[in-house]
Curated annotation (Swiss-Prot):
Identification of the protein by name: Ubiquitin domain-containing protein UBFD1
Xref: InterPro entries: UBFD1, Ubiquitin-like_dom, Ubiquitin-like_domsf, Ubiquitin_CS
Gene: Ubfd1
Annotated region (Disordered), positions in chain: 106-139, 231-263
Residue ranges of domain Ubiquitin-like in the record: 143-218
SMART domains in alphabetical order: UBQ
Disulfide bonds: none
Highest taxon in the source lineage: Eukaryota
Any Pfam family matching the protein: PH_UBFD1_C
Biased segments, Basic and acidic residues type: 233-244, 251-260
Amino acid sequence: MLKRGRGRPGKRRRRVSIETSTCFRPACVKLGAGAGANLRQLASSRRPLRSWWVLYTIIMAAAGAPDGMEEPGMDTEAEAVATEAPARPLNCVEAEAAVGAAAEDSCDARGNLQPAPAQPPGDPAAQASVSNGEDAGGGVGKELVDLKIIWNKTKHDVKVPLDSTGSELKQKIHSITGLPPAMQKVMYKGLVPEDKTLREIKVTSGAKIMVVGSTINDVLAVNTPKDAAQQDAKAEENKKEPLCRQKQHRKVLDKGKPEDVMPSVKGAQERLPTVPLSGMYNKSGGKVRLTFKLEQDQLWIGTKERTEKLPMGSIKNVVSEPIEGHEDYHMMAFQLGPTEASYYWVYWVPTQYVDAIKDTVLGKWQYF
């Protein structure tokens, strides 16, 4: 007799194992064709479903069904279950092999990477990647000062760095007016030294900078001799006796030094003092003083009777000569007109101020 399985009631077994079916092979042989003939009768009988499946399995085994054959409809269900089942976790050996394979893939990927070609120095793309922070600096970050440049009765408002030198200021004026730096006379409380900064000479914002000078064409027009005869005349004048020996000058020099004459420093050159130059004689022997009004570009010649205010641009020439026996003092003349008769003579000028007077009145470009 076949024993009923121990499964829970109502739960159908999916398959019958090969071992179960082969156990009944001897019985199936005895049954033979009789069991097959009665198969239709078994299907229509009221036996339990489990018994029917057991008998079916026995008959199929007896008929020579290969071991491991499963019931119809079971493969699809098993495949669905296998598909839904989670992946089995890897053991240590498989995990180590997977890590090694990943490392090889990473090395291959790195080997395929090629460095980007270097851009040539002149490549515009390489130049575009460079930051153009300043220039600079050019004036970025420098303290600027507002100045009013006055030249030829024209005002120019400019901004320059406070730490720029007098030489750099002349270059700035040259870019504005066209005056070459060598022909500029830049004044702010006296001549502006080229080697000092605007900060050092205490230039403040809004200051007025006076510029005196002529263009190259103007200088050539004034100083170019009209003919060779004029050059010969100048050469003859140089061969004449010293001015201090001429009668018109001798009568003034014979009076001696004024009692209030300014002290002199032989062999030295100094800037003009901030006070007027005094203690000098004019051609009539009267006391005279010279005041240089740089802000107004004027020279004031003061006597006891009156003060003449002369624009510096109207002075054609300045000549000087040391006084014999007193070489630390000069006699000096300012040419106010077209001829020598218009010379205004001044005597006993301290030698250290002679060059400063010529530079202030004529500018450094003068050739005398």
